[in-house]
Amino acid sequence: MKKIENKTFGGERPLFGAHDICMEGITITDGESGIKCCSNIECHNSKFYGKYPWWHVDGSVITNCYFAPESRSAIWYSDNMVMKDCTIDGPKFFREMNNLELENVSINDADETFWKVDGLKLKNVKLHDGTYPFMFSKNIYVDGLESDSKYVFQYCHNVEVHHAHITTKDSFWECENVTVFDSELNGEYLAWHSKNIKLVRCHISGEQPLCYMDNVVLEDCTFDPECDRAFEDCSNIDAHIKGAITNIKNPISGRIEADGIGSITYTEFAKASAGACEIIDKSK
């Protein structure tokens, strides 16, 4: 690989069409499309300030780099990328990509980040602020995620999450084939309108979780007292709850078991009669 060290690039497309290069200590200043239509590139200990600095790149490794707020929409249409030990302060990163892997990365404005990514692996990643991370992405594996960004994981398919701490309402909406292990899911309206959802040893908080769903499985999950009106219009439920749940409302079918159930509500709008879903209060 050709080495480029300790240089500054500005203007339009200064490294357009570069292949087989290793960059160390470079700076991309004001301008656009600093690295574009490239392949087989490494970049280490560098800083990015210009807009759209990394588009249409196939095969890249980025480590110990900083992306400033001005570097918005920085990495799009780039496949087969590994990023480690980086800090990102710009919005709208990582769009329409295949095979993207991040480890020890902090994203401090996660607005519209990870859109339409197929094949995403995250390890020890932090997301802050912004809306709709992960929209329309699929084939996702996460181990270690802290996020207070709004509306994460919407319209996603084939997702596996471990050791996450997620704080937002409307997470995991319109999703299919999702499994979450050993995580904290904080926020109202968890996983509405989703199907084939499995939660294992998770703690759930927020109003009206898990509604309008088909095929939802819970294993040894716990609920905060604020979790009322759970499982409304849910079918094919298989829920084993540790501790108590405050309220269950209008479930359609399946089985719900908890150590304690505050109340069960069936209204005139219920889509199934009482008893169609088996509900077991182990305290009685």
Task: List where the protein language model places each region.
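Long, distal/terminal scaffolding or interaction modules
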Residues: 1-284
